[in-house]
Amino acid sequence: MTLPLDGVRIIAIEQYGAGPFGTQHLADLGAEVIKIENPAEGGDVGRLVGPHFFEPGDSHFFQSFNRNKKSMTLDLKSPEGMEILRELAAQSDAVFNN
């Protein structure tokens, strides 16, 4: 079954609740959402919110707002990280930030 946003790529620089909730709907509608997480902070702070499935960091809260997404860590404070972000953005339909 084809979904309305099949073929749309969105780079999501987001964390916690509102941003991930919004892009979750876009992913559910078929968009390829690539979530960018900060490695220096351990990724999205939503990972720390309980309850946890099996161990700390495996948060039910995080999983529920980030289903159907791809995820990668990227240091946006480094020149290399910013270059990778620019390359991803050039190959995407939208960049989302909250």
Model-derived regions: residue spans:
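N-terminal helix-loop segment corresponding to the beta1-alpha1 unit
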Residues: 1-98
